[in-house]
């Protein structure tokens, strides 16, 4: 398997027996998992993940056993990179960090469940804190939305004029003519640092009848938040394997 300029030998690839209509209609033709190997479901013998193989095959240096993710956005369509996304394996893109005007901030990660899980004990909406004692979250590029507690969802959409819970779409919506200055500043804690969701990512898709389906929705019965692409589009994520930290720098 080849990823950019890296070749991974003897990489196991699972074949799907059934695919959703949404997946079939998408532009991609596969899913690259970047979680930890302990959630591997291959039977009878688990296999190494792509990143584990990169490390064991010395495709990335021992001094930089990490990967990074920068998810592009439509807001950058007029930029030189056209808003394209990228991953790096084995190095941090210093130009992206420099452009953010910030240093990478690291938070301890609990990988006991196989996820990039960290403490996320608060959120803010227009500067007002929403306490989430004992709360944890995972960063997941494979999840489109940000999925958070009901209390946090309510605080966010209470701050957007005309927002409502749409029973038909099973989620919060708000008027499509909502201007940027009417949208709240929303941040989520990653360890001790708050990171903002870009306002243009608060809306996900057209919900009809002049409404937009929100990019942040309820996590339902899950006991942790999933900070997916809605959140990740606003940051540059650095994920070291060796010391199990998760590093984030705001993108501006």
Enumerate the language-model features and the residues they cover:
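Non-catalytic N-lobe/flap surface of aspartyl protease domains
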Residues: 1-100, 155-189, 210-225
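Structural motif
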Residues: 3, 124-126, 141, 190, ...
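Flexible, small-/acidic-enriched active-site or ligand-binding loops
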Residues: 82-134, 204
């Amino acid at each position: 398997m080849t990823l950019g300029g890296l070749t991974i030998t003897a990489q196991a690839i699972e074949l799907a027996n059934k695919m959703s209509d949404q997946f079939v209609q998408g532009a991609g033709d596969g899913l690259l998992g970047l979680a930890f190997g302990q959630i591997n479901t291959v039977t009878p013998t688990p296999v190494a993940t792509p990143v584990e193989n990169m490390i064991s095959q010395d495709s990335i240096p021992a001094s930089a056993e990490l990967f990074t993710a920068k998810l592009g956005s439509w807001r950058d369509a007029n930029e030189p990179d056209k808003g394209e996304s990228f991953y790096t394996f084995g190095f941090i893109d210093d130009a992206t960090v420099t452009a953010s005007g910030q240093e990478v901030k690291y938070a301890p990660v609990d990988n006991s469940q196989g996820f990039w899980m960290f403490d996320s004990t608060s959120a803010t909406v227009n500067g007002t804190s929403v306490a989430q004692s004992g709360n944890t979250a995972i960063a997941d590029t494979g999840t489109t939305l940000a999925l958070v507690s009901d209390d946090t969802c309510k605080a966010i959409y209470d701050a957007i004029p005309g927002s409502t819970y749409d029973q038909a779409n099973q989620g919060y919506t708000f008027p499509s003519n909502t201007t940027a200055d009417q949208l709240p500043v929303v941040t989520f804690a990653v360890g001790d640092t708050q990171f903002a969701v870009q306002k243009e990512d608060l809306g996900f898709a057209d919900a009809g009848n002049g409404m937009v389906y929100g990019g942040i929705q309820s996590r339902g019965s899950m006991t942790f938040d999933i900070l997916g692409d809605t959140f990740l589009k606003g940051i540059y994520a650095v994920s070291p394997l060796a010391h199990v930290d998760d590093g984030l720098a705001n993108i501006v």
